[in-house]
Curated annotation (Swiss-Prot):
Protein name listed in UniProt: Orotate phosphoribosyltransferase
Gene Ontology biological process terms in this record: 'de novo' UMP biosynthetic process; pyrimidine nucleobase biosynthetic process
Reaction(s) this enzyme catalyzes, per UniProt: orotidine 5'-phosphate + diphosphate = orotate + 5-phospho-alpha-D-ribose 1-diphosphate
Gene: pyrE
Family label: Belongs to the purine/pyrimidine phosphoribosyltransferase family. PyrE subfamily.
Entry binding sites for 5-phospho-alpha-D-ribose 1-diphosphate: E116, D117, I118, V119, T120, T121, G122, L123, S124
GO molecular function: magnesium ion binding; orotate phosphoribosyltransferase activity
UniProt KW keywords: Glycosyltransferase, Magnesium, Pyrimidine biosynthesis, Transferase
Amino acid sequence: MTNDDVLDEFRAAGALREGHFVLSSGLHSPVFLQKNLVFMRPERCERLCKALAQKIIATVGQVDVAVSPAVGGIIPGYETARHLNVPSIYVEREGGGFKFRRGFHLEPGQKVVMVEDIVTTGLSSRECIQAIKDAGGDVVAAACIVDRSGGKADVGVPLIALASLEVPAYPADALPPELAAIPIEDPGSRRLKG
């Protein structure tokens, strides 16, 4: 599956949006990938995650388990794990970091691929990878459907992206005038309070 094929899936779902968005990272961007509109269609999610699983196997070989960060990584993590024929587990935010809960655990030395939906700065990925390492897992790679950083995000392990985009993202105090003139939408989930 090519970059264009992946973006076509997002376009077909109405999930490639343009405007002025505050991302979960707190950065501002003229482009937002509304992944939930992609993942809500099982056949679309299956195509993307099957291709990601194939890319994982071609890059690092077989793994023992796929671990994802809740909430956004659960669906692509599960579907990718299904195509890898390995268990899918996830970590949840607790006390400022990610933790294994709900009976999930790793056996020491298990080969783990960390599966994300979208990577922008790599912060959530790094936090998830740290939780995996703390639990004794051997993180052989991280994988995502889309790397918005164009390969610049450092997650601390090799990053396998089904598609890579170089989408600009700016801190609030460094917005270009044309972006600052557009009303802000805040579709990110990190700042939601439950």
